[in-house]
Amino acid sequence: MRGLLPLSNQEIDDALNSHHDLIAPPSSYAYLISLRALRKPLLVITASSKAAEDLAKEIREFHSDTLEFPAWETLPHERLSPSSDTVAKRISTLQSLQDKSRNWVVIAPIRAVIHRFNSQIINTKPILIDRGAEFDLTELQRELVSFSYSRTDLVERRGEFAVRGGILDIFPPDQNHPIRIDFFGDEIEDLSYFAVADQRTFESISSGVKVLPCRELLITDEIRTKARNLATKYENELLNKISNGMLPEGMESLIPMLVDKLELITASMPKNFESIFNLKK
């Protein structure tokens, strides 16, 4: 940092916007990127997921409007689904980017940048659950199924929900603990976190919670119809299961067949964004 210390923030910013090289140690990258973000939104591309995660933590210390867009842990054609918390981060970032008034810094590994995703998830509004809100419980269950949640007898994993009388348990992908929703008629009376181990509530939730989809392929009526039509042409176990409203492991591998519009993360960035490549391993 010794070469940077005599410079003011303005001088550093001017240097970053000039055609001259600015030599600086890796430890200063986060600070320099945050300065650059004062002028325009940035897409910072890293070599690996670990590098993206580490750099995002550092940049967030200087620039609060920092988002992560992680890559799937799986390859596109593997019969495995990406983890629900990865999906939640990706969807949350894409929805945050709809606010074009802020100078976002998006950190993404190169695999995430070149991977086309289902653009339908951008405009899928989260379900807001809060005390006093009213829902038809049957309709809410349908919405959760369309968000690719699985109904079970007991909620133990992210992406599951269960219903017992006027109580709905759900484990959103971006939460550390599942949530118990107590209904009085159609009105939400109470919200609490509960433990998976003993299924007992341990903390009341004071504010509303946004329920995001837990998969990037949403099992809508349109998707089920497409899967059913394709299943008549191609013998495929995944297509058969999707057409019946099931959520098979690895169903995301069929997104290119079932979804008409696929996009890159660059399409969701503000128009004046700038890319920064930090591809050192």
Feature map (PLM): residue ranges:
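ASCE RecA-like P-loop NTPase motor cores
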Residues: 1-281
